């Protein structure tokens, strides 16, 4: 298949996620897609959003009752399904499902007047006042059932279901694919620091020392304009110590994506600062995003999309714990609660929530993405919590559970992996392409009610070692 082949476009999400031989992605549309779009079910637990050839859909996730998987038919090795799987996956990753709910007051940021007033007053409001205003805005967040808190894997589980259908249609016991992480690592973790205020700038050297004491390198995102002056010497220090420099918004005023023309003007300046800083990555202020506009950016990866956005001003979430491409930009989703949320919204100085998220993500081989602000993390209680997190991450690395990487390293790996191919035939599969020396051939198979992954020869384990996913088809 070539990239413009309609059949490949239909099956693109599955092929790109697993990097498996394209012959195993043999899905076709059953019927014609009906006008309109909405929510439906893909099995008893999963929610999808988009069009279907059945015409059944709901306006909200809670009202979704039609299970499209009941209407799958198989002819030969082809599965005929009543939806476009790549479109459904894109609708979740790019948060297009939020559009219909905004009409009901869900998923939008505060009104322009309220938000303008808040940002005008923000420099004069301490955290103690801001957190109470934010708690008022977030009231009732726990009633939202979709995306699933504290970690949502809807995209990953949809693709696992499709892979299971493919195995049954092809009558094979396993399907080869390129393992998600280099050198056979079970999962991945990145640590990032958004620098919000001048006090955070001053705290960067101390935070680097804390990170280094656990043998961990991280990335620092700096705001180029208005908030504070970015000392060139600090950028040089960050890079010299093996940490990473990235761009954090333009001026963090909350208006980056308000108007297309103004956004393009700002994007040009953001691209300029990315070149000046030697930065490959970006994160917008307050995790604002509009993924359909990312073609204006020149950076390599973005880190602005939460896995679950219930506790952010812009609600939504990408519903995956894996990196994914938005055009040429790689998205590294924020998959764990931010420190500000933990300390000031939940008033929690334990790492219990982080531990829950770590367990859910690592047992499903995903990306652990943490954002800890220098502005909030050096007060004693916060510092103690943060060092407990670092100790846990260091332990996971020693145990071989995570690849502790810089964001730019994940970006480079994921791009290499996307260019690799599996060639050969059953029993003689091989990986070809750039970076293949770090890649591991893996196999997905159905083991009872679970998808099971086995490695050909993972690092640090005997051949045939098994790792299990929590997917139940």
What are these regions (language model features)?
Residues 1-221, 225-229, 296-297, 328-473:
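Terminal accessory/targeting
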Residues 320-321, 327:
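Eukaryotic tandem repeat interaction scaffolds
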Residues 186-191, 199-201, 208-315, 327-343, ...:
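Metal-dependent polysaccharide deacetylase catalytic core of the NodB/CE4 family, i.e.
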